[in-house]
C-alpha cells in the first residue's frame, strides 16, 4: 500500500477543520504519516484521533515562513518513502510544496478539490465555471487541497480514535539551504473566536452597501458561527482589514453557506466565492450581478433584512 505524507506546518493543541479534511482524504489514499514543524510530543497528542502511523518532526519548533520547514519536508518524505504528499492550499502550504517539488524534481498540482486512488486530481477553474482533471506522472506526487473540499460526513467516518502515533525526530540544519530568508519578528493577528476565513463553513460578507458599518453583519456571523468576509471596495475603504477580502486578488473560499450583503457581485469578487455550496445574496439593486449566481436572493436594504435574519435565528435557538 502506498504511503501518504500529510504536511501540517504547525499544530495547535487541536487540529483545524482544514487539517482534519486533509487527514480524512489521506486515509483513502494509503498509509498516513504526518510531517510537522510542531514538537513531537504536541503533534502526537493532537493526532491521536487519526489513522496516522508516524509523526515526523524537527529537533526544534518550526513554523512558516521558516525555510527550514522545506528541509524537514524533504527529509521526512525520503525517510518515510512517501509517494504522495498533501498540504492545505494556503499560501504557506503552497509555498512549501512548490519548493519541495523543485528539490525532488517532482510534479505538483495546487488547489485540488479531490484526489482519487489513482492519483487523479480534480480542480475547479475559471471561477468555478469548469472542473478539470489532472494527473502527475512519476513519484512522489505533490498536491495542495482547497479547504472545505471534503464533506463533513467523509471526515467523521474516516477519523476516529486510533491510538498514539510513533514519533520520529529528524535533524534540521540551523540555517536552511541557501534560503537568504531570516525571520526577524513575528506579530500575531488580533485574536478572534470566529473561524479562519478560508476554512469557515459559513461566511458572511459585506461590500460597499455596508457603508462602513459591519456591526450588523457581525451580529449575523455570531449567530451562525461564521467568518466575516468583504469585497475589495470595503477593504480599500478601510472599513475592514484586507485579510477579509474575498475575490480574485484576495482569499478564495468554498463554504457550505455564503451570505453576500451589499455586494454587487463583480466578476473579480465572484471568482473568490462562486464555488460555495449555497449562496444567499442581499442587495437593493435587483439587477446586481450577484443574483445571477445566487441560490436565494433578497432584494432589499441589508440594514432592514439582516436584523430580521438575526432575530429569526435567535428565536429559533430559544424555542
Describe every region a protein language model picked out.
Residues 1-319:
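N-terminal glycine-rich FAD/FM-binding segment characteristic of electron-transfer flavoproteins
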